[in-house]
Design a protein with these regions (language model features):
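Inter-Walker segment of RecA-like/P-loop motor cores
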Residues: 14-56
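Conserved segment of the helicase C-terminal RecA-like domain
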Residues: 307, 313-331
Length: 331
């Protein structure tokens, strides 16, 4: 896996299934020792623990490597080191959002030669809905008065991902600043938060579900939290975002330790806890599992696999849930 939270999540899943002969790796040295000593176990690790592997650790040809979230961290240095360490291993990539681009290509990293499209096996959204593993997604458009210039956002987003000259980067910074001003306009923030609260109280809370509000950036997280606190009890919402918490960090008050964040998320998963809404910008948009989450209020330009992974936070099976709902404020 490529993140600590996924490591914890998968380890818990294996433990719940009572899988024998399993071991979690605590650091890079332990991983290297296990590989070099040819330990025959199911080893769960993050790919980052291959970061110091400079040469072959084990050249056996009956090693199986299963990579979760295989569309990430595979084409760069970490993926190369893992393949160097285990040169003859069979690699299986698991992902809901394979990427096929020049610089990031899941099919190059894992693709099956036996299939024209590079897949070994596919399990679609329709398959998961049929099996009641997930719920369908519904989308709700918001009144156009809350929208901003979507074409400008799309163009700016496209430029961000392209190779830019220094002059182009300067021009983009100016356009992005204008976009941020539009998104953070006090009247717009107030209008969206009013809509969020009204919608939540009418369509989400009565059914026993909870929500997530995805904002443009960390400043927006704070702006929306302050606006929401005027419309609903402060304990009903919480910010979860990346922050160093160091001296001079303007978002230090929102920093949570790993334990505190886990406690907060456990409270969120509890239907009897007053915490009803998480305000985020980049955290909890992948890998976060909370079946009680039914509605995502989306006020951030997103696309491709990032968008797909984010909106799927809402489609987990939960008592009484018929669908996940995405309320889009950018159109």
């Amino acid at each position: 896996v490529d993140r600590i939270d996924l490591d914890t999540q998968i380890t818990a899943t294996f433990n719940a299934a009572d899988i024998p002969n399993m071991i979690g790796v605590s650091d890079r040295k332990e991983l290297q020792d296990l590989c070099e000593k040819d330990i025959r176990k199911i080893i769960i690790t993050t790919i980052h623990k291959f970061g110091e592997a400079e040469s072959v650790l084990n050249d056996r040809s009956n090693i199986i490597v299963m990579v979760d979230e295989a569309h990430r961290t595979q084409e760069g240095d970490l993926g190369r080191r893992m393949r160097t360490a285990l040169p003859n291993a069979f690699l299986f990539g698991l992902t809901g959002t394979p990427i096929n681009k020049r610089d990031r290509n899941t099919f190059w990293a894992f693709g099956a030669d036996e299939d024209e499209q590079g897949y070994l096996s596919r399990y679609s959204f329709q398959d998961s809905i049929r099996d009641n593993a997930t719920k369908p997604l519904h989308f709700e458009a918001v009144d156009v008065k809350l929208h901003i210039d979507k074409d400008a956002i799309d163009e700016a987003y496209k430029n961000i991902t392209d190779e830019l000259s220094e002059q182009d980067r300067d021009d983009l910074a100016k356009r992005a600043a204008k976009m941020a001003v539009l998104i953070k306009a006090p009247s717009r923030v107030q209008a969206i938060c009013r809509h969020v609260v009204d919608h939540f109280k009418e369509k989400v809370e009565p059914n026993g579900f909870k929500a997530q509000l995805v904002t443009f950036d960390r400043e927006c997280c704070v702006l929306y939290k302050k606006a929401l606190d005027e419309l609903m009890p402060p304990e009903a919402s919480a910010i979860v975002m990346h922050t160093s918490g160091g001296k001079g960090d303007e978002y230090a008050e929102w920093k949570l330790s790993k334990d505190d964040e886990e406690k907060l998320l456990d409270r969120y998963r509890d239907p009897n806890d007053p915490l009803q809404m998480l305000i985020v910008t980049s955290k909890l948009l992948t890998g976060f599992d909370a079946p009680i989450l039914q509605t995502m209020y989306l006020d951030k330009p997103m696309k491709d696999h990032n968008l797909l992974q984010a909106i799927c936070r809402t489609n987990r099976v939960y008592a009484g849930k018929t669908h996940g709902l995405i309320v889009d404020y950018l159109g």
